[in-house]
Design a protein with these regions (language model features):
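Gly/serine-rich nucleotide phosphate-binding loop at the start of the catalytic core
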Residues: 1-76
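Generic detection of short hydrophobic beta-strand segments and adjacent strand-loop junctions
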Residues: 7-9, 135-138, 198-201
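Hydrophobic/aromatic-rich, well-ordered segments within soluble, folded domains that form packed cores
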Residues: 9-13, 88, 296
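Non-catalytic, well-ordered alpha-helical scaffold segments
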Residues: 17-20, 24-27, 74-81, 252, ...
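Stable alpha-helical structural segments in soluble proteins, enriched in small hydrophobic residues
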Residues: 33, 79-90, 352-362, 366
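Long, hydrophobic, amphipathic alpha-helical segments used as structural scaffolds
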Residues: 34, 38-41, 87, 91-98, ...
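Acidic carboxylate diad motif detector
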Residues: 52-156
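Positively charged, helix-rich recognition surfaces that bind polyanionic ligands
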Residues: 142-144, 157-367
Length: 367
C-alpha cells in the first residue's frame, strides 16, 4: 500500500531560490498547457491528452523558454498530469472548469518522482536528498520502511516548507473485532456513538478567535503590499496553521480510536457544501470538521480491513424509535433532546438514538 510521511524541511537560501523557481515554472507549465488544451478544443473541437500536453511542453515550451530546462523534469510533467486530472474531474465528476493558477496562491507545491536514487532520506544526518536541491535539512520525527515512489515539496502560507515522501510499504491490519458502531455527527459535540460515547467538539477556532480578530484588524490598517502588511499576514497564517494542526491532531486521535475498536462504522453522508451556505452555522460546521473526520475514517477503514458506510442524508435517524421503529414527527423540532416513544415507552436521548438508527440502517445495507 502507498503511505505518505510528511516532514518539515529547512532549505538554505540557495535551495529556497530553486524551490521558488520550481513552483513558478510548474505554475507556468500548468497554465500554458491548460490554455493550449482549451485553444485546441475551441478551434478544432478536438480532445488533447496529457501525453500531447507533455509533448507540447518538451517540444515547444522548453524551446521558447530556455529557463524551463533548469527545473526538474518530473516536477513539470506532474504539473501537466495535475492539470489533466482537474480537466477529467470537470467532465466526469461535474467539478468546476480548471482555473489558471496565480502566483499569489497561499499554498504552493510540486511533486517529483523517484528514479535511480534521486530521492533519499538519511535519518542519521537528518537530511533529505531531493532532485536539483541536493541534501536538505529536515526534522525527521518518524521513520518508515518501504520503497520511495515520489516526493512533494510544499510551502504553506506561514512560509514553512514541508516534504511529503510517498512510500510503498506493508501495513499490518488491526485484529478483527465483532463490535460495530453508528456515529451521529453534531455541532455541540463532534460526534455521539451508538454506545453512548461522546467525542467533544474542542471549538479550536473559538480559543483563537480574539487573537485572530486582533491580527486581522491590524492587517486591515496596514498599507497593502507594505513590509508590515506581509509581516502581519504571516502572523495570521501562523495562527490559522496552529488551529489546523490542533484540529487535525485531535481528529486523528478520534478516528484511530473508532477504527481500532470497531469492525463496521456507519455515519451519515452529510452534504457539507450545502450546509455551510447557512451563514448562522457556517463557522461552527467548518470548525467541527465533519469532512476531515469522515475522510480519515474512510481511508483508515480501507487500511485496516474495516467497513465504513455512509447512509443517505435524508434518512430519518432522529425521528425513529431505535427499539420498535415508530416514527415520531415531534422530534423534527431540534430543541427536543429527550423523548419517550408513544408506542413502546422506550426513553431516548436524541443523539444516541439517532446513532443507533444509523448503525441499524448501515448493517441493513450490507446484510
Amino acid at each position: 500500500m502507498l503511505k505518505a510521511y510528511k516532514y518539515r524541511i529547512y532549505p538554505n537560501s540557495e535551495q529556497r531560490i530553486q524551490i521558488a523557481k520550481t513552483f513558478g515554472c510548474c505554475r507556468f507549465v500548468y497554465n500554458q498547457t491548460l490554455a493550449y488544451r482549451k485553444e485546441i478544443y475551441e478551434k478544432e473541437k478536438k480532445s488533447v491528452s496529457k501525453t500531447d500536453c507533455n509533448n507540447y511542453c518538451n517540444r515547444e515550451l522548453k524551446k521558447d523558454y530556455e529557463w524551463l530546462k533548469e527545473i526538474d523534469k518530473f516536477a513539470l510533467t506532474n504539473a501537466i498530469y495535475n492539470m489533466d486530472a482537474a480537466y477529467q474531474k470537470f467532465f466526469k465528476e461535474h467539478a468546476g472548469y480548471p482555473k489558471f493558477k496565480s502566483k499569489h496562491d497561499n499554498h504552493k507545491s510540486y511533486t517529483t518522482n523517484f528514479t535511480n536514487g534521486n530521492i533519499a532520506v538519511d535519518f542519521e544526518t537528518g537530511k533529505i536528498k531531493l532532485p536539483k536541491l541536493k541534501a536538505v535539512k529536515a526534522r525527521l520525527h518518524r521513520e518508515y520502511r518501504g520503497q520511495i515512489k515520489s516526493a512533494t515539496v510544499s510551502q504553506v502560507s506561514s512560509g514553512k516548507y514541508y516534504v511529503s515522501i510517498l512510500v510503498e510499504t506493508e501495513h499490518k491490519e488491526l485484529a478483527h473485532t465483532n463490535h460495530n458502531i453508528g456515529i451521529d455527527l453534531g455541532i455541540k459535540d463532534l460526534c455521539i456513538t451508538s454506545d453512548g460515547k461522546v467525542y467533544e467538539n474542542q471549538k479550536i477556532i473559538k480559543k483563537y478567535e480574539k487573537q485572530l480578530v486582533k491580527l486581522q484588524r491590524q492587517l486591515s490598517h496596514k498599507g497593502k503590499r507594505s513590509k508590515n502588511y506581509y509581516k502581519t499576514k504571516k502572523k495570521v497564517a501562523i495562527c490559522h496553521g496552529k488551529i489546523r494542526n490542533m484540529r487535525k491532531d485531535y481528529l486523528h486521535k478520534v478516528s484511530h480510536e473508532i477504527i481500532s475498536e470497531n469492525q463496521v462504522i456507519v455515519s451519515e453522508n452529510l452534504q457539507i457544501k450545502n450546509m455551510v451556505k447557512n451563514h448562522h452555522l457556517a463557522k461552527a460546521i467548518s470548525d467541527v470538521s465533519w469532512y476531515e473526520l469522515t475522510r480519515q475514517l474512510e481511508y483508515k477503514a480501507k487500511w485496516n480491513g474495516r467497513k465504513y458506510i455512509k447512509i443517505d442524508t435524508f434518512y430519518a435517524s432522529s425521528q425513529l424509535c431505535s427499539v420498535c421503529g415508530y416514527q415520531n414527527p415531534d422530534t423534527k423540532d431540534l430543541s427536543v433532546r429527550t423523548w419517550i416513544c408513544p408506542k413502546c415507552g422506550a426513553e431516548h436521548d436524541r443523539d444516541i438514538n439517532a446513532a443507533k438508527n444509523i448503525l441499524t440502517e448501515g448493517l441493513r445495507q450490507i446484510a
